[in-house]
Structures are given as structure tokens and as C-alpha cells.
Amino acid sequence: MSEIVDIYAREILDSRGNPTVEVEVFLESGAMGRAAVPSGASTGEREALEMRDGDAARYLGKGVLKAVDNVNNVIAAELLGWESTEQTALDQKLIELDGTEFKSTLGANAMLGVSLACAKASAEELGLSLYQYLGGPNGRELPLPMLNILNGGAHADNNVDIQEFMVMPAGADSFKEALRMGAEIFHALKSVLKKRGYNTAVGDEGGFAPDLKSNEEALEVIMEAIKAAGYKPGEDVLLALDVAASELYADGKYNLANEAQPLKTAAELTDFYADLVDRYPIISIEDGMAENDWDGWKILTDKLGKRIQIVGDDLFVTNTKIFKEGIDKGIANSILIKLNQIGTLTETLEAIEMAKRAGYTAVVSHRSGETEDTTIADLVVATNAGQIKTGSACRTDRVCKYNQLLRIEDQLGEAACFNGKDVFYNLR
């Protein structure tokens, strides 16, 4: 009864008003799975290809009708009659159909939509939630959220070099409590910014992007907000940064335009981070070096890898081949997981499993262009990854993931677990 009888894709809009792919997979039993594909703003050079039409007369060239056509005509013709529960075989067939390293024939957006919709249809067929279908009885760990509450860098027009400032309510006893703490800090930050005369409009991911004077001021207003919300920095709440250092890198140096000494070598940038870690309760730094500066990554990992989580996003792009090379070279100690960077569910699960075997942490992440699709909420619980990065406590395209996690926590009941600070198991 899990035989695939129809596959249909359409062009829909993401949270930034850009087209993306939505796929529906229908089974013989009448079950249906639907998945919408996210889209990144700042992307790694080695990410799987997001296929766009390039037709300037439609959506400024960002249409996805080619990818939609690939689903409706190429992929559907091959997969009709397959059992949707054969996820690994289905994903392997998609990879073979595409035949390229970076999914450039069919488009990772076409392939991922089909891959996820098949999994959702199978879960529906079996009467299971997606996290239950993917994780079985062992999938029960609710994640510690990274709430992106303040933006700089490429995500904002201000004097802050670092792209994302996040709070992690690691002192909470449950996901529900962690989310409440994060939301309260978000509102407290709004009040702090207003009091200082700053704009409180939010960006793509729901974080504030005021015209702050420096990286230091960004950290200071967040510390003030944590205290104003009634929490203790370093005890109840930890900080995480996404530097997006590839955006700052040119000619072998990093340009932090708003620092006293703007141009920094990898060693000097590492010292800059070490100083921040000494003075603020920072537990995680993502993309602290440029994706191609592997020597810089090694310097950073050697100096801070025992103290904080060092996350590779653009560095690894959820690609097990690249990730294995990083593990072998002792680079970073964590991987950011983005489904559309690699293009199939199976390859995503393999990356998470590889991280665990190597003693790395895995942080499941959204993209800046999101939809109402909540797949990553189920994925993070199914895999017991322990951490999720899906924006601020603002904007429905972000909050829908948090709300799905609240539902999952309720559904699990006494079986649910939440590890708080212990998610950083490789720092103990």
C-alpha cells in the first residue's frame, strides 16, 4: 500500500518572497506527503546546486519552474511504482538520475522536495509522526535552541561584523522552558534597544538589526537583555555566534571593519575570539574562519576546540566527503546540518551519524529563506542531534518549527528528554 502512484511539484513562495519548490507524493493507500524546500542567502561554494530559471522576466530570474519540471517529468517517471518506505534506495536513485557531484542536472531543490515528501508520505501511511518514522523509539531528545536575536554582517546594514548573535537557554529543564526563556530575552532585548534609541525592525530570521556601533555593543545589549529578563548569563543562558567569516575574507586576511585593528590574520582573529570567550559566556562559534582557509580553521580549533563548540557550516556544507576530510585533519568539532546543502534525506542522516561517530556535535539548521514546512523539527528529535538553529522567537516561518517541537514534546510526554548544557558532550 506504500506504492507511489503520483508525484507532483509546484512553485510556491518562501519567507523572502522568492520562489521555491513544493512536492507532494501520493501513495496507493491514499496517504500523501508534502515538503517545501528552503533556500539560503549566504551559501557555501560547495553546496549542492539550487536550480533557478534565470529568466529575468519572472521573479527577477529566481523562478524554479525548471526544477518543478524535473520533478513532474523526469523524477516522477522513474519513481512511480516504487515503495515510498525504501528511502535509501529512493535517494540513491535520485543521485544516480542526477549523475553529478553537486546535483546540477536535476537541482538539489527538486531532489530534496521528493526525498522529504516520500518520507512524510511513508509516515502518514504508517500513522506515525515524522520524527517517530525517522527515529523509531529512540528518537526522543528535544533540542537546545539557538535563538538568533541580533544580526550584523551580511544580514544587516550596520557597524557589526559578526552576522548572528544567538542565545542558548542551556539552564532550562525542558524545551518548553528553554523556548519561554528565549522569547522573554527577545522581548527584553527589544526594550533595551528602544531605550537606547535603536530601531527594532526584524530581519529575515526574526532577529533585530539595529545600527549598533560595534561587535562589543551587540554583546553588551544582549547581556543587558538576559539580565533584564531575570536570567544569569553563563549560568541560565549561553551565547553563540555565527561569524560568516567567508564574507570578511580577502587576500589572506579578515577585515573586521569596525575593530581598532581591522585587518587580521587567522591567528589574530583567533586571539580576538579567545578574548571574547574570556569576557562573555560564548559557548559556540560558527564559521569562525573562511570556508577555504583550512589552515585558519586548524589554528582556531587547536586554540579553542576544548573550550567551545566550533561549528562548520560553509566549511562542510553537510557533505560527508568534505566532512570526513575535516575530521581527519582535526578541524572544528561540530557540523551545521542543512538539508538543502546536500539534497537528500539519506545523505543528511549520514552526515549526522558521521558527526556522532567522530565525537562531533551536530546542529540542525534552517535557511534564511524558509516556509511553513517543519521537517527540521522532526529531524532534530529523530536523530537526537540535541541542538537546533531556526531563528528568533518571531516570524511564523521560524516559530512554526518551535511550535512543532512543543507538540512533539507533549506527544512524547514522560519519554521526552532535554539535556541542556550536556548537549556539548565533546567539551566535558
Swiss-Prot record:
Keyword set, alphabetical order: Cytoplasm, Glycolysis, Lyase, Magnesium, Metal-binding, Secreted
Pathway in which the depicted protein is active: Carbohydrate degradation; glycolysis; pyruvate from D-glyceraldehyde 3-phosphate: step 4/5
Enzyme Commission number(s) from the entry: 4.2.1.11
Compartment(s): Cytoplasm; Secreted; Cell surface
Keyword Ribosomal protein: no
Top-level taxon of the source organism: Bacteria
Main location: cytoplasm
Catalytic activity: (2R)-2-phosphoglycerate = phosphoenolpyruvate + H2O
Cited Gene3D superfamilies: Enolase-like C-terminal domain (3.20.20.120), Enolase-like, N-terminal domain (3.30.390.10)
Binding residues annotated for Mg(2+), in chain numbering: 242, 286, 313
Enzyme class: lyase
CDD domains (UniProt xref): enolase
Cofactor stoichiometry and binding remark: Binds a second Mg(2+) ion via substrate during catalysis.
A GO BP entry: glycolytic process
Residues holding (2R)-2-phosphoglycerate: 163, 338, 367-368, 389
GO cellular component: cell surface; extracellular region; phosphopyruvate hydratase complex
Cited function: Catalyzes the reversible conversion of 2-phosphoglycerate (2-PG) into phosphoenolpyruvate (PEP). It is essential for the degradation of carbohydrates via glycolysis.
HAMAP family: Enolase (MF_00318)
NCBIfam families: eno
Protein name: Enolase
Record organism: Syntrophotalea carbinolica (strain DSM 2380 / NBRC 103641 / GraBd1) (Pelobacter carbinolicus)
